[in-house]
């Protein structure tokens, strides 16, 4: 989060309940787990889809897993804040009860520019205070960068598709 640029950058998404400062605080909790002497335990139990709803009272591995899922996997959620991690397609392909994370009501990051990726099927998304820059390099499409020290200016280059192994 760069307050002077009014910009928050995340890999995937931010739950509607988190503001930029809380997002950074929670990301640091995961960073500490990765740097800590129990990092192997954290990584061993990292992958999972529960808990799927934020609560400030979450603790331990459940808390770290939820934070990690939001910041690295989140694409969709429900109006009550439940994650929809199974869906990976572009908006419109998901079940009707799910919304893109950035369209959920009450989003506490709505007043800052959020730059995110991890959604190749979405493609380039430019809205007021929202910039999705995953343009599908992994699929042989484009790699996109953005200049943030002013109005968002994007730059894209063609990628080569990596053969399946």
Where do the PLM segments sit?
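Feature recognizes metal-dependent phosphohydrolase scaffolds
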Residues: 1-165
């Amino acid at each position: 989060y760069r307050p002077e640029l009014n910009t928050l950058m995340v890999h995937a998404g931010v739950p509607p309940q988190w503001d930029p400062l809380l997002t950074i605080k929670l990301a640091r909790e995961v960073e500490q787990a990765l740097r800590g002497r129990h990092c192997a335990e954290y990584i061993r139990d990292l992958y999972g889809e529960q808990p799927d709803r934020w609560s400030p009272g979450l603790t331990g591995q459940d808390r770290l897993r939820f934070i990690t899922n939001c910041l690295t996997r989140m694409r969709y959620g429900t109006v009550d804040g439940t994650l929809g991690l199974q869906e990976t397609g572009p908006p419109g392909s998901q079940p009707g009860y799910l919304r893109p994370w950035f369209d959920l009501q009450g989003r506490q990051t709505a007043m800052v520019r959020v730059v995110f990726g991890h959604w190749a099927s979405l493609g380039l998304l430019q809205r007021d205070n929202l910039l999705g820059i995953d343009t599908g390099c992994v699929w042989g499409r484009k790699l996109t960068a953005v200049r943030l020290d002013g109005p968002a200016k994007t730059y894209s280059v063609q990628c080569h598709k990596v053969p399946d192994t």
